[in-house]
Amino acid sequence: MSLENVLTPLRQYRPKRLICLFGCGGNRSAGRRKGMGFVSGRLADMTVITSDNPRFESPEAIMTDIETGVLEGGGEYVKICSRLDAIRYALEISDRDDIVLLAGKGHETYQDIEGRRTQMDEREMIRQILEEKNAGIVRRCDN
């Protein structure tokens, strides 16, 4: 599984904590969700389960499928449906010696929700959140 191929080498850097944020796309293989959750639960110190192109499926149902796998993997986790809030949470709880992996979006700059593509550039979101964090600005995350 590709998530395992990323998390395993990241462990070699010996981070204080490895925080893995991801979601699974809707209207795709539901069987992979539990497996990806299991991998993250086993290899990451904290899994942040979030939304990633739910398409016409319920984001909450997708996240519950992932949660089942994380629990079986013995992992600590939190579920935050809003991808922006999830990224903010992952970065806010991270320390200097942690690694935060945001998996899934890559080059995509949108969220596909109920047939509509909503603009969402994670790189810009991360830049803004880190600038706020470095400036000491604290925002409340709804989780």
Residue spans for each PLM region:
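ATP-dependent carboxylate-amine ligase
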Residues: M1-N143
